[in-house]
């Protein structure tokens, strides 16, 4: 089952980094694909259960992916977050945002 993620958004700093660093861009897209396929990355078991409940109840879903060592020197954080907003009243998820934790 793939998650309906709505429109994909990035913070401006992630967009700039993805434009200038192909390896980061690939990592970011791989993280998004994992999130969409319900692989929440580097989160604790409790947060995985919360995400699993949110998939069926329409709540917000959050994943976290640790950057490979070769990318950390280019980034302000050691991971990125992928957040899909909760369903609206029509049952649609309107957007998913990729960001650094420090931008939250």
Which residues does each predicted region cover?
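Compact soluble domain cores
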Residues: 1-70
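Short, compact, well-ordered microdomains
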Residues: 61-104
């Amino acid at each position: 089952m793939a998650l309906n993620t709505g429109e994909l958004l990035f913070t401006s700093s992630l967009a700039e980094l993805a434009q200038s660093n192909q390896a980061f861009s690939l990592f970011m897209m791989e993280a998004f694909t994992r999130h969409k396929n319900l692989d929440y990355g580097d989160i604790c078991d409790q947060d995985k259960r919360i995400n699993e409940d949110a998939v069926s109840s329409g709540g917000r879903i959050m994943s976290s992916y640790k950057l490979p060592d070769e990318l950390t020197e280019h980034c302000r954080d050691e991971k990125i977050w992928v957040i899909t907003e909760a369903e609206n009243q029509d049952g649609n998820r309107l957007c998913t945002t990729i960001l650094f934790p420090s931008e939250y």
